[in-house]
């Protein structure tokens, strides 16, 4: 639906509802921001290129902490490393609530580990972290699963014999297979039709969630839900994924051996059985389905997209690729696969991966937070349950922490001696109590997949480096890199 038509519909709705609702009323002492119109909120201040561009422009006028109205609801926007850290770290508990993303809220409805709040969130997060951390005791570790998947990937890339290919599907396959092995207890063949359908649904959904129309939907979900749009396709996609998860749960239930849990679903089912007499338990079927869906979103699409962007950067900056491969040769050699222990001995490669994540800026304003109580912050009072958008992009491009914020520069993460250094502006997984559940697995995957590929292959592009375009194809909730062609040439 065209922006102008959406604007007209929203404006007409505003006129109709004005008599009933009047101007949005602020409570507490919210940070400054543009004056909202009835129902429309700050629509007229929104940039046609999306919410991120809008927020960054408003920051120039109102500073690092300001309020915008998305429709009739106030949202406090945090920009810059310092403001985000003050909120999510220094006042972690107060800012630990989870807000909604309008296009997926009809599916999650506050269930599952990502969008839950209160005791439900605490119980599911504790369980999920413990299960993923402890899973594999006496079996294969997560690192071994990733190494196995990396070997399968190398075999698949060798089959291409240096032909041009789009790496999107393969990179989705490898990251999805890691979560599948943890959640379902199995990996899929790359040509499995059920697996390919799942991958298509996830990729399509992430792209749609990141689209401009989904950002407009965020402004007026109660009104626009009655019209055709991407929100309906997202709902259908996620429902189909949930059906697959539900079928897998039933298969697990039928073959469950309490003395030998095979995977995340088995462990969850055992917890459900243990708590069945407790009516207040959060371990029920709905939370199982939506927590598994959450794990896929947290651990597959984001990591695969980071890898895709990483290799696009390696094509554009071949001198960086050469230096990474030199470090691989010095530390690992060619006769054994990379291991996680190698990372501490490879500061340049680690810095490159950090810089890929920083410049890739995959989730520009994170997943929305809410404050769990009336909260004093920088002289303002943010009322309980107010939504908060931490603009992670503004930290990842913060010139106070990154010397050349808009340029690919691994030196951002290296000290004068060439050792890896911590940078306060680096927060691609967010911060605080809501830091990404899959951070540990994602960091392990990025290192092992990245180094295994460059250990075994040289890469080449059909276009010269200077002509490679890094502009995201979609830029909303997520930044989706453009599709591109690449050759993997066996070394």
From Swiss-Prot:
Location in the cell: Endoplasmic reticulum membrane; Microsome membrane
Cofactor(s) the record lists: heme
Class of the enzyme per the UniProt entry, highest EC level: oxidoreductase
Catalysed reaction equations from the record: an organic molecule + reduced [NADPH--hemoprotein reductase] + O2 = an alcohol + oxidized [NADPH--hemoprotein reductase] + H2O + H(+)
Result for mutant: residue 436 to S: Conversion into an NADPH oxidase with negligible monooxygenase activity
Chief localization: endoplasmic reticulum
One of the GO biological process terms: xenobiotic metabolic process
Topology in membrane: Peripheral membrane protein
EC number: 1.14.14.1
Job description of the protein: Cytochromes P450 are a group of heme-thiolate monooxygenases. In liver microsomes, this enzyme is involved in an NADPH-dependent electron transport pathway. It oxidizes a variety of structurally unrelated compounds, including steroids, fatty acids, and xenobiotics. In the epoxidation of arachidonic acid it has a unique preference for the 5,6-olefin.
Protein known as: Cytochrome P450 2B4
The species this protein was found in: Oryctolagus cuniculus
Organism phylogeny: Eukaryota, Metazoa, Chordata, Craniata, Vertebrata
Gene name in the database record: CYP2B4
């Amino acid at each position: 639906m065209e922006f102008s038509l959406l604007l007209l519909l929203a404006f007409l709705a505003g006129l109709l509802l004005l008599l009933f609702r009047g101007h949005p009323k602020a409570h507490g002492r919210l940070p400054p921001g543009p004056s909202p119109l009835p129902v429309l909120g700050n629509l007229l201040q929104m940039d046609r290129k999306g919410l991120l561009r809008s927020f960054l422009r408003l920051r120039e006028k109102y500073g690092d902490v300001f309020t915008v109205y998305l429709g009739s609801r106030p949202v406090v926007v945090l920009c810059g490393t310092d403001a985000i850290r003050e909120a999510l770290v220094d006042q972690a508990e107060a800012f630990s609530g989870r807000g909604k993303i309008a296009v997926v809220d009809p599916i999650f409805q506050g269930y599952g580990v990502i969008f839950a709040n209160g005791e439900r969130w605490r119980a599911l997060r504790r369980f999920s972290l413990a299960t993923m951390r402890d899973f594999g005791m006496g079996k294969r570790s997560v690192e071994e699963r990733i190494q196995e998947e990396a070997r399968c990937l190398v075999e698949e890339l060798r089959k291409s014999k240096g032909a041009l290919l789009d790496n999107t599907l393969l990179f989705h396959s490898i990251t999805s297979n890691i979560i599948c092995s943890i959640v379902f207890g199995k990996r899929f063949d790359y040509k499995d039709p059920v697996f390919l359908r799942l991958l298509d649904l996830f990729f399509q959904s992430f792209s749609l969630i990141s689209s401009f129309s989904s950002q407009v939907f965020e402004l007026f979900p109660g009104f626009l839900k009655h019209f055709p749009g991407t929100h309906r396709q997202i709902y259908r996609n996620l429902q189909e994924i949930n059906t697959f998860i539900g079928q897998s749960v039933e298969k697990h239930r039928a073959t469950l051996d309490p003395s030998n849990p095979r995977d995340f679903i088995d462990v969850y089912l055992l917890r459900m059985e243990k708590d069945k007499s407790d009516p207040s338990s959060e371990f029920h079927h709905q939370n199982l389905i939506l927590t598994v869906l959450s794990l896929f979103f947290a651990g597959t699409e984001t990591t695969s997209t980071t890898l895709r962007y990483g290799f696009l950067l390696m094509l554009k900056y071949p001198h960086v690729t050469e230096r990474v491969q030199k470090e691989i040769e010095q530390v690992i050699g060619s006769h054994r696969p990379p291991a996680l222990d190698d990372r501490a001995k490879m500061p340049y490669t680690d810095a490159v991966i950090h810089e890929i994540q920083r410049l890739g800026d995959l989730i520009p304003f994170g997943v929305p937070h809410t404050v769990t109580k009336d909260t004093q912050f920088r002289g303002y009072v943010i009322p309980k349950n107010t939504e908060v958008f931490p603009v992670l992009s503004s930290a990842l491009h913060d010139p106070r922490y990154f010397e050349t914020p808009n340029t690919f520069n691994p030196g951002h993460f290296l000290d004068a001696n060439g050792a890896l250094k911590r940078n306060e502006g680096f927060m691609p997984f967010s911060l605080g109590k809501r830091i990404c559940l899959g951070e540990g697995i994602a960091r392990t995957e990025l290192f092992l997949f990245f180094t295994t590929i460059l250990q075994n292959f040289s890469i080449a592009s059909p276009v010269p480096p200077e002509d490679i375009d890094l502009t995201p194809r979609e830029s909303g909730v997520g930044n989706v890199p453009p599709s591109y062609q690449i050759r993997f040439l066996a070394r």
